[in-house]
C-alpha cells in the first residue's frame, strides 16, 4: 500500500499550501463520513412508514447495523494504518462507504437496508484513524489542536448535509437522498488517491523515528495512562449523550412538535452547519491560545462546555413549547461540537507517534459502541415500551433521562486535566506546557 509517486521523502519539506490542502481534503472526507452516517436519523419517519418498522428496528438500523462492523473492523484497520499507506486506506474506505450509502437508496426491505448499513460501517472504520494520524504528520504538535479543530468542522458540515436530506426526501423520496449522498463520495475518493501525499511518520515530533507498536502495546500503554483513560471514557460518554440525543431529534420534532420532515431537517441543518461550524471555528481560535499557556486548559475547557450544554439539552427534550425546544436546541447542538478538536488533540499528544491511529481507533471503538449501539437501541426500545402509556410522546420520555448524561462526560474531562502532566511525559510530549 505504498506509492512513491504520492509519498513525501523524509527530506522533502511540506509547504504551507500543501499542509492546508491536505487538511481541507481530509475535512471534507470526514464531512462525507458524518453525512452518510447521519442521513439515516433524518429519514427515520419515511423509512419507518415505507418499510413498516418499529422504533426498535429503526434504532437497530440507525446505530447497531453501522456499529457491528465499524467497531470490530476499526481496531485492526487502525493497526494497519500505523504501518501502511494512510492515503490509500482513506481513499479505499471513502469509496467503499459511499457505494454502500448509495446502495441504501435501492434497498427494498429491512434486510437489504441492514446489509447496506453494515457495509457503510466497514468503510467508515478505515477513515478517521488514518486521517487524524495523517494530520498529525502534516502539522507540528503546537499546531495540532488548531489543525484537528479545523478537521472537526467536517462533523458539523456532514451533519448539515445529513440533516438536509429531509428536503430531498420531501421532493424525491428517501431513496433519492441516499443516492445524492453516496455517488459524489465515490468520485471524491479518486481525488484523494491522486492528490494526497503520504508523509514520514513522526517527522514533526522532534523525536527519533517511531518503533512500530502493536495493538497489544497500545492497550498496555493506555492502561498506564490515567489522562488517556479519562479522555477515552469522557469521549465515549460524551457521544452517548450528544449523538444519542441527536440521532432521534428529527423524529422527536416530527412527533412531539408536529413539524414536517423538511422543516425539521432544515432547522437542524442550520444548527449543525452554521451553529456547529461557528463553535468549531471559535474552538479552533481558543485552542490556539490555550495550547501556548497551560495544557490543562484544554480538558478544562471541554469539561466546562459539556456541563453548560447539558442544561439546554435537558430543557429541549422536556419543553412542551416548540419555540422553547428550538431555542434550546440552538444552544445544545452547536456547543456539542466544541469537544471534537480538543479530544482528537488530547489523544494525539497522550500517545507516541507509533500509536496514534490505534489510539483514535480505541476512542472510536468505545464511542461508537456508546452512540451507535447503546443509545439508538436503548432509546428505540424505551420508546416502544412507553408507547402504550404515552403514545406519540413516548420518544420524548425516552430521551429526557439521556439528556442528564452530559454531566458524567464533563467529569471525566475534568479528571483528565489532573493527570495530564504525567501523561504527556510518558508519551514523550513533556515539552508541552503544564503550569505548576
Can you describe what each PLM-predicted range is?
Residues 43-72:
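Extracellular/periplasmic helix-loop-helix junction of adjacent transmembrane segments
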Residues 191-195, 312-319, 400-432:
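Multi-pass alpha-helical transporter architecture, strongest
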Residues 151-194, 198:
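Helix-loop-helix hairpin linking two adjacent transmembrane segments in secondary transporters
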Residues 40-41, 226-280, 337-340, 344, ...:
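Extracytoplasmic gate region of multi-pass secondary transporters
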Residues 9-15, 200-232, 256:
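Juxtamembrane intracellular "pre-TM" segments in multi-pass secondary transporters
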Residues 116-155:
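Cytoplasmic helix-loop-helix junction between adjacent transmembrane helices
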